[in-house]
């Protein structure tokens, strides 16, 4: 398959970081959350993650082989997709459902659209939504963590947010409550996100704008902003999924618009809809709007003065 050149808005910054190095850093950032999920939900968390990652790598290699493309599983992009997809599953999910999700994420969302760099949406997000729609009962069957507080034993914090107070903040930080693998331990997600920012893998603009928007709207609506920030998939989505290079804007203005949109949609679904969580749908909807955001936030041409009204530019 011939190499394609894609040019986004100038100016352009060159970097010695390869796709492989970037993806490896993302994997490193997710390891603390994986360890936390094993502590909270048991060894099945690790097994489910391993199966999902293996399935993603297999489908990527098999598809490329069948289509006569270069097999580039060593870039770790399929590993990242597999880990993110597993982080969006409960530890009790049957392994074959995880494989179905991996097929949807890698083959349908990523490879059928041209492979890495051409997918219209985050593959793991679409995989999660597809599984939630097709296997709703299994995807909402959250295991009871060890030593969890009664209100959060097997329910997500968002489902019982009205019962939570300041005394439960530590539980939300440590993740000792119901939920999917990668959404419970807020502190490891935050540490992973800070690592990605410190190593310049991601820009802080999208996650900061996203989280700030949710916090402000929570206060305006009379809800506890800390519970909203530490619950559900917000931390995972803000730092690891909304910042995907392919499906997020490249301009700073675009990133701010993107983050604002994510926060507004997430809160609209959480506060006004029938679903407790809205992060996945918010990211998917904003992924679809990225081309329009890019066009309308494109940087002005440098070195050319704007024409004055009634006269030509000098």
Give the location of each predicted region.
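N-terminal signal-anchor module of multipass membrane proteins
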Residues: 1-53, 57, 306-314
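Generic transmembrane alpha-helix motif of multi-pass integral membrane proteins
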Residues: 33-36, 81-90, 104, 189-196, ...
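Structural signature of hydrophobic alpha-helical transmembrane segments
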Residues: 42-55, 92-101, 172, 176-184, ...
């Amino acid at each position: 398959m011939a190499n394609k050149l894609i040019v986004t808005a100038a100016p352009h910054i060159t970097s010695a970081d390869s796709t492989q190095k970037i993806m490896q850093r993302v994997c490193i950032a997710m390891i603390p959350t994986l360890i936390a999920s094993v502590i909270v939900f048991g060894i099945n968390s690790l097994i489910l993650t391993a199966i999902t990652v293996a399935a993603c790598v297999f489908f990527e290699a098999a598809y490329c082989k069948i289509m006569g493309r270069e097999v580039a599983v060593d870039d770790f992009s399929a590993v990242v997709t597999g880990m993110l997809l597993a982080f969006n599953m409960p530890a009790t999910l049957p392994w074959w459902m995880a494989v179905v999700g991996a097929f949807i994420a890698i083959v349908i969302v990523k490879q059928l659209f041209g492979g890495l760099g051409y997918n219209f949406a985050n593959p793991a997000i679409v995989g999660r939504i597809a599984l939630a729609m097709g296997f709703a009962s299994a995807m909402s069957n959250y295991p009871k963590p060890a030593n969890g507080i009664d209100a959060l034993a097997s329910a997500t914090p968002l489902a019982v947010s009205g019962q939570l107070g300041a005394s439960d903040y530590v539980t939300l930080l440590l993740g000792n409550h119901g939920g999917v693998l990668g959404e419970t331990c807020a502190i490891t997600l935050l540490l992973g996100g800070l690592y990605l920012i410190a190593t310049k893998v991601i820009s802080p603009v999208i996650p900061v704008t996203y989280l700030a928007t949710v916090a402000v709207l929570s206060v305006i609506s009379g809800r506890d902003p800390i519970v909203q920030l530490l619950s559900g998939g917000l931390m995972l989505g803000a730092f690891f999924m909304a910042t995907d290079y392919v499906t997020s804007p490249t301009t700073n203005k675009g990133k701010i618009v993107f983050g604002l949109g994510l926060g507004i949609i997430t809160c609209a679904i959480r506060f006004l809809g029938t679903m407790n969580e809205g992060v996945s749908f918010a990211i998917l909807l904003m992924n679809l709007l990225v081309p329009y955001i890019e066009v309308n936030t494109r940087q002005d041409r440098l070195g050319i003065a704007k024409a004055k009204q009634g006269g030509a530019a000098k």
